[in-house]
UniProtKB/Swiss-Prot annotation:
It holds the Pfam family ODP. By homology with NorV in E.coli, may be involved in nitric oxide detoxification. It comes from Nostoc sp. (strain PCC 7120 / SAG 25.82 / UTEX 2576). Residues 263-405 form the Flavodoxin-like domain. PROSITE patterns: FLAVODOXIN, FLAVODOXIN_LIKE. It comes from the Bacteria. This is Putative diflavin flavoprotein A 4. It is an enzyme of class 1 (oxidoreductase). Keywords: Electron transport, Oxidoreductase, Transport. The gene is dfa4. In the N-terminal section; belongs to the zinc metallo-hydrolase group 3 family. In the C-terminal section; belongs to the flavodoxin reductase family.
Length: 575
């Protein structure tokens, strides 16, 4: 497997994957966007497919990032004037840019999509109305030579216009946002599929965990098709692990639904910005073992919203501001919350706006006036979110989850005898001491720092350390092989720890008042530390509520020869 590197330019890889069928993989070896789903920084591919039978169909052209190189490469394999159909698994503003260029070259082509996608396209491009054909579940399009395409609608809150396409000739199911992974490599198929597990699971958690119910419904629709390959919108074509990957999706959905705590995430998104915020908050919740029921209020009816609100443990509402007001769907959802949700439920508010944010203020004030407690500071974002804002959203989701867990623990009746035993055990475990350290990481140009004492030397040759990190402590920046960090071992008598003693969730910069220098691996060295180690992650293991990381020490230096290591003394092993 060739892992993404930033030294290669973007390109389009073309190959045969079946009879009369080509894949065109628009590839970037760098992080494509700043959304949470791309944060593992393994690059990505935007997969498009061309079926050339008696009639020709192009499936899922990529977004604006690849428009020019994609169309240039496509022209080597297709006379645009002979293209009959363009099939869309979903529609968004990014993809519309490519569609405009493509339709100017192929004005005779018909756009095939779901009904919600057709409505969106007709609104954005009224002049296209005669060229758009909406399809329903199990509609069939015959391209000739055995290529009968069956369409399977797969709506979800994030992609209400989702559409699968199944080709009976090649038995390929084109799955768009399902069964993908953000990873760029030369391999077309999933021969080495076991090494893809981490990327696949992360992709699912980011995109589908908050909509597990709808994902299961989509899986039920395709199970009878008998597909032999999945052709996703991102990552390798699934041929060798199809049964296992399908099973994984069902298990991951069940895992979400079986969580003890459940949050209703209610939102609408006018231009996509509020939806991006919702996805980042959901990721913070999912990473902290909370089930998220994502509800796009533009699609859900009042009965469904009422049922979800009544059954959840916490409610988070997101809204854009349109003309100084919240959309009607959000006003309806807010009314349901205020009239049916117990006041003991934790709440949260977020939203995006252009010139004013009245909708966000309205929701916040209504919830506060009704005596709901907010689980994080209300998030207000003007225009498009930045990477820093998305990190704040993810941290807000983590904070919300931890507060829910604490609330549940307070409400749980205690049994006297087992509790006494637990207390004694916790007290004993708490006597384990560790060196106080600050771990510094880097996410592109953003530096992070966390305080920990859960570190020990693990190996002598090569020198290596073992460290336990909670998910909410930016564990994603150290969760895969090759990630680098600096372990700053603190010196007794210095007060460096106070800058890192609480989780920074709203953009605080703990390094602003500290002297630092940059290590060879790009992370920060605290010059007031006793010593530092530059480390590279080589192995990881999920253990309970922590990620256990083994890292090899690349280099290190003692900064204060006469200093003594700062040590944390605890009285309980529960924190």
């Amino acid at each position: 497997m060739t892992i993404a590197t930033s030294s290669r330019p973007r390109d389009v890889q073309v190959a045969d994957i079946g009879e009369h069928t080509l894949i065109l993989r628009s590839r970037t070896w760098e992080r494509l966007k700043f959304e949470v789903e791309y944060s593992r920084q393994r690059g990505t591919t935007a997969n498009s497919y061309l079926i050339q039978a008696d009639k020709k169909a192009l499936i899922d052209p990529p977004g604006e990032s690849f428009t020019a190189i994609y169309l240039e490469q496509l022209a080597q394999y297709l006379d645009f004037t002979t293209l009959d159909y363009i099939i869309l698994g979903h529609v968004n503003p990014n993809r519309r840019v490519t569609l405009q260029e493509l339709l100017s070259k192929a004005p005779q082509a018909t756009l095939i999509c779901s009904r919600p996608a057709a409505n969106a396209l007709k609104t954005a491009f009224p002049e296209w109305e005669s060229r758009i054909q909406a399809v329903r579940f199990e509609d069939i399009l015959d391209l000739g030579q055995g290529h009968q395409l069956t369409f399977v609608t797969a709506p979800t809150p994030r992609w209400p216009d989702g559409l699968f396409t199944y080709d009976s000739a090649t038995k390929i199911l084109y799955t768009d946002k399902f069964f993908g992974a953000h990873i760029c490599e030369d391999t077309l198929f999933d021969e080495d599929w076991k090494k893809l597990d981490a990327e696949r699971h992360y992709y699912f958690d980011c995109l589908h965990a908050p909509q597990a119910k709808q994902v299961e419904a989509a899986l039920d629709k395709v199970v009878m098709l008998g597909a032999r390959s999945y052709a996703p919108g991102h990552g390798p074509v699934v041929r060798y692990s199809l049964s296992r990957f399908t099973y994984d999706y069902r298990q991951w959905c069940q895992g979400q639904k079986s969580q003890d705590l459940n949050v209703a995430l209610l939102y609408t998104s006018a231009y996509g910005n509020t939806g991006i915020l919702a996805n980042a908050i959901a990721q913070g919740l999912v990473q902290n073992d909370v089930n998220v029921q994502s509800v796009n209020c533009e699609l859900a009816d009042t009965a469904e919203i009422t049922r979800i609100v009544e059954a959840c443990d916490g409610i988070i509402i997101g809204s854009p501001t349109l003309g100084g007001h919240a959309p009607t769907q959000i006003q309806t959802a807010l009314g349901i919350v205020l009239s049916t949700a117990a006041k003991t439920k934790l709440a949260g508010v977020f939203g995006s706006y252009g010139w004013s944010g009245e909708a966000i203020d309205l929701i916040e004030s209504k919830l506060k006036d009704a005596n709901y407690r907010l689980g994080f500071d209300t998030i207000r974002v003007r225009f498009s979110p930045t990477p820093e804002i998305l990190q704040q959203c993810q941290a807000a989701g983590a904070t919300f989850a931890q507060t829910l867990k604490k609330n549940k623990k307070l409400r749980t009746p205690r049994q006297v005898i087992p509790e006494a035993k637990i207390d004694r055990t916790e007290q004993a475990v708490g006597r384990i001491i560790g060196s106080l350290c600050v771990v510094t990481t880097r996410d592109q140009e953003s530096h992070k720092g966390i305080l920990t004492s859960w570190v020990s030397q693990a190996t002598f040759n090569p020198p290596g350390i073992m460290m336990a990190i909670a998910q909410e402590q930016n564990a994603d920046l150290m969760s895969h092989t090759g990630d680098q960090f600096v372990l700053n071992i603190l010196k007794e008598g210095r007060n460096v720890r106070r800058y890192f003693s609480r989780q920074s969730t709203l953009g605080d910069n703990p390094f602003a008042n500290l002297k630092t220098k940059t290590a060879d691996n790009g992370c920060l060295i605290l010059t007031e530390a006793l010593a530092y180690l530059e480390c590279t992650v080589t192995n990881q293991l999920e253990c309970g509520d922590r990620l256990l990381i083994y890292a090899v020490v690349d280099k290190g230096e003692v900064l204060a020869n006469d200093g003594v290591t700062a040590v944390e003394h605890r009285k309980s092993g529960s924190h």
